[in-house]
């Protein structure tokens, strides 16, 4: 008889978040009494049947992480099970590498893998890509709702902006709509008012975000409503809803869209995002298609009163028109990361992990140690895992020997040195990808010749008051490669 594995805290929390009672009942059809439900026990039962498929439903568990986990926890699997998972991984990796909904010329056996042929016998895609595509295509294009705008409840700044008011109407009055806008355009403000107007129309509104980090960021800007992750909504859905608002929709992959499609029941949909931010992790770019097919309102005017030159620089990087007469009083150029930190940089953003490592070594506090020798009291740290106590990308500061706080009333206590080092990194230097969704007053950006326009745009627009460029820009930033849609 096989002994049940003792999973790490991070994996245990991941299992409990994903394999909720509602999930196993709705998705797997298991008949379990709610009062007797045990997520870990149920997970182990499912793993015994389908080790790869069960693990790969967890957050951040692709083929490689799943294979490592199966080996680490001594979970048996067959060669056939590994083959199926590996084929899926290889084909989807090829799709991501070639920025396409299809993979051309794959030679392996695709039977039972979730990979399917597309017309031509040498062109392949995934079942979830097909599902995502069909879901989008079957949504009503120009269907109107019976909602109306409660003008007396609209804030004056929004009423005074024709652009923002039209965006509000577009999302409230259309059954499927998009709201897009770059940094500083007031997208979150308008999103909050969309939710408010829908609730005034007595609608039950579900607000979703792709990650815990984006969920937290939006929650702070809403008047009303509670934000959930798409993952928790799909796997733990209970009760009816009238409207689904999806923030950071540019982070939707085909897999995530297909999961949404599996629980969709005709609700009004509002997609919100910045078309110039970084693409999703995973294959597919469904938000690009949605913008083309459904009523879309774009916010263009800069509403940020401070540091307009930073927003203008972000637009210049993208090749968009801006007011060339704006004084660049908030942008500084220095030669080294050390100089940037002396000018008050709270964080240095760069494409390379080597640059992140150097920034962390420069700024780390070399004072009273914390519970782990590599971290000191006063150090800024960033979570790199999701647990019940913190989420991936959440920023903290170590305040005592074994405690850190995030400045918003949340604290985490470390019971062992490894609980700190396994779940957190220093946060003086971050990759640009890791910074998306966060803002700081003073940001240093160290460009590289690997940066695309979108990477540079995201890095620049993380700064609210002061931007410090380290080493200067390359002659030109690379174009983000277009995604080829099915």
Task: Give names to the regions the model predicted.
Residues 1-486:
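Conserved ATP-binding/catalytic motifs of P-loop helicase motor domains
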